[in-house]
A protein has these predicted regions:
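Flexible, compositionally biased loop and terminal segments
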Residues: 1-240
Length: 240
C-alpha cells in the first residue's frame, strides 16, 4: 500500500457526536482530544511521517464563551498530556497558527512542548491552534512586505518557494491526503495554500468515532487516486 507521507485532518463533529449521546458539547471535545492521541500512534504505525490536525480555528472564537473557555481549558491539559505522549512515542510537535492571541500560560506551554520535542525522530505532529489559512497568508505577506522595505527581499525575485518560507508550515511538505470527518464538504479556511494538489477524503464518521479502520479506509481510497499535479501521464498522451 502506498502510504501518504503527510496527512492533514479537520477534526469535525465533536459537538454533534456528544449531543447525539445526550451529553454536553464539551464532553465531545474531550473525547475528540483523546482520539487525537490514538490516531497519532496509528498514523506512525502505518508509516505516515507528518500528521497535521485542525484543533482550533481563528473563527472558533465566535462560539459561545463557555465553549471557548472549555476548549482553552482542554488545550491547557492537552499540552501536558501531549508532552508525555510525545516523549513516549518520540514525536516532534509543532504548533501552527497565530498563538499571540492565546493566554500567556498556553503560549508558554506550547514553547516548552516544541522545545522538548524538537529533536525527536518519530511522527512530525502539527497542531493548528488559532489557525486560519487567510490569516496565515496575510501574516506572511506583511512579513514579506517588511523585508522588501528593509531591502532583504527583492520583489522581482519572489517565487512560490519564497512565499512558503513565510508560512507557518515552513519546512513541512504539503499534505498528500486531507481528511474531514462528520460529513461536511468544505475546507473551512484550512491550509488553502498547502492543499493545492492534495487528495481529499470526506467521511460521515464524527471525529470521536474515527478509528484505525477509518484511517485505513481513507488511505485505501487515496491509493486509488491518480495524482497528476496538473499534467497527464505518458499513456494518456499517447492516446490523445
Amino acid at each position: 500500500m502506498n502510504v501518504p507521507k503527510h496527512v492533514a485532518i479537520i477534526l469535525d463533529g465533536n459537538g454533534r457526536w456528544a449531543k447525539a449521546k445526550g451529553m454536553p458539547r464539551n464532553y465531545g471535545h474531550a473525547q475528540g482530544s483523546k482520539n487525537v492521541e490514538r490516531i497519532c500512534k496509528e498514523a506512525w504505525r502505518m508509516g505516515i511521517k507528518y500528521l497535521t490536525v485542525y484543533a482550533f480555528s481563528t473563527e472558533n472564537w465566535n462560539r459561545p464563551d463557555d465553549e471557548v473557555n472549555a476548549l482553552m481549558k482542554l488545550l491547557r491539559n492537552y499540552m501536558k498530556t501531549c508532552l508525555k505522549t510525545a516523549a513516549k512515542n518520540d514525536m516532534k510537535v509543532r504548533v501552527i497558527g497565530d498563538v499571540t492571541r492565546l493566554d500567556e500560560d498556553i503560549q508558554k506551554r506550547i514553547l516548552e512542548l516544541e522545545e522538548a520535542t524538537k529533536n525527536n525522530g518519530g511522527l512530525n505532529f502539527q497542531i493548528a491552534i488559532n489557525y486560519g489559512s487567510r490569516d496565515e497568508m496575510i501574516r506572511a505577506i506583511r512579513k514579506i512586505a517588511k523585508d522588501c522595505v528593509d531591502g532583504k527581499v527583492d520583489p522581482a525575485e519572489i517565487k512560490e518557494e519564497t512565499f512558503e518560507q513565510y508560512l507557518d508550515t515552513k519546512g513541512i511538505p504539503d499534505p498528500d491526503l486531507m481528511i474531514r470527518t462528520s460529513g461536511e464538504l468544505r475546507l473551512s479556511n484550512y491550509l488553502l495554500w498547502q492543499l493545492a494538489y492534495t487528495e481529499f477524503y470526506f467521511t460521515d464518521v464524527p471525529w470521536p468515532d474515527f478509528s484505525k479502520e477509518e484511517l485505513e479506509k481513507a488511505i485505501e481510497t487515496y491509493n486509488h487516486r491518480d495524482r497528476r499535479y496538473g499534467g497527464v501521464k505518458e499513456e494518456e498522451e499517447q492516446n490523445v
